């Protein structure tokens, strides 16, 4: 039994239930100011109290989890799909196209992403949305999986069953879809989870620096707002503690899910 895989899956599922099921329970818009009295402590009505702007911390946290997961999923989908496509195309095409694609890919792998992300988010600050933020982060999410998929394609295309498929009259597209893609998708699931984790971490880092969209309720922005309003000095520990604890637990859950899944794949290969 893979404990890490099971535990990570349970933790991740809990966050997805909070972010995509509980989120749609009818409630007051948590971003609206002065909905409730300011700086309330924990109570039966407000489990984690209220902020200095009169917002319910629980619903603010649920909104933040939802938006952070949306950003992570968009980045993971775009990065994985583009990475798999470019990697397979490069690995099977070869020649000049392969060299050209790898030059672009290597450029995106080696250039430092954080300074560019800081510059772009600074330029778009105030006008950015959840989707735009995700698209910016996705710019750097495809390059590494592209290299991995290309290496996989180069290795697999020389195996006997690929040559057999060619001799049997299958086209290149058929071979890629039926023979190569299943291998790529197995690895891509691990990359998908890793990209989700990385995107949430990147957005949180930018938010704490004050560079995430100010109208976006995310885990990072929750921490930034609590810090800006001196939550610690005002002894509003639940306000600043809730997003920090949620971020840590989400990261641990995703990390255990990724490592557990990789161990599972290693066990399958060893059989």
Where are the regions that the model predicts?
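Hydrophobic alpha-helical transmembrane segments of membrane transport/permease proteins
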Residues: 10-52, 207-216
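Generic hydrophobic transmembrane alpha-helix motif, especially the helices
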Residues: 47, 57, 91-92, 97-156, ...
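Transmembrane alpha-helix signature in integral membrane proteins
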Residues: 57-92
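Membrane-cytosol interface at the C-terminal ends of specific transmembrane alpha-helices
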Residues: 76, 84, 88, 126-178, ...
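Glycine-rich helix-loop "coupling/hinge" segments at transmembrane-helix boundaries
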Residues: 122-123, 153, 202-242, 246
């Amino acid at each position: 039994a893979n404990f890490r895989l099971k535990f990570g899956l349970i933790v991740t599922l809990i966050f997805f239930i909070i972010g995509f099921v509980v989120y749609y329970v009818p409630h007051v818009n948590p971003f609206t100011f002065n909905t409730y009295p300011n700086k309330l402590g924990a109570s039966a009505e407000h489990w984690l109290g209220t902020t200095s702007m009169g917002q319910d911390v629980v619903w603010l946290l649920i909104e933040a989890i939802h938006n952070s997961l949306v950003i992570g999923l968009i980045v993971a989908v775009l990065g994985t799909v583009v990475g798999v496509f470019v990697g397979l195309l490069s690995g099977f095409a070869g020649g000049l196209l392969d060299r050209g694609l790898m030059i672009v890919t290597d450029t995106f792998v080696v250039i430092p992403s954080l300074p560019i992300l800081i510059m772009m988010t600074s330029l778009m600050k105030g006008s950015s949305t959840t989707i735009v933020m995700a698209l910016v982060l996705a710019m750097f999410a495809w390059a590494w999986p592209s290299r991995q998929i290309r290496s996989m394609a180069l290795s697999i295309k020389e195996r006997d069953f690929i040559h057999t498929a060619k001799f049997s009259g299958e086209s290149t597209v058929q071979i890629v879809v039926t023979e190569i893609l299943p291998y790529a998708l197995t690895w891509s699931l691990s990359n998908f989870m890793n990209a989700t984790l990385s995107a949430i971490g990147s957005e949180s880092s930018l938010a704490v620096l004050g560079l995430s969209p100010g109208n976006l309720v995310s885990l990072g922005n929750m921490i930034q707002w609590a810090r800006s309003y001196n939550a610690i000095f005002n002894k509003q520990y639940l306000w600043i503690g809730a997003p920090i604890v949620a971020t840590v637990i989400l990261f641990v859950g995703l990390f255990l899910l990724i490592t557990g899944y990789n161990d599972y794949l290693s066990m399958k290969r060893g059989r």
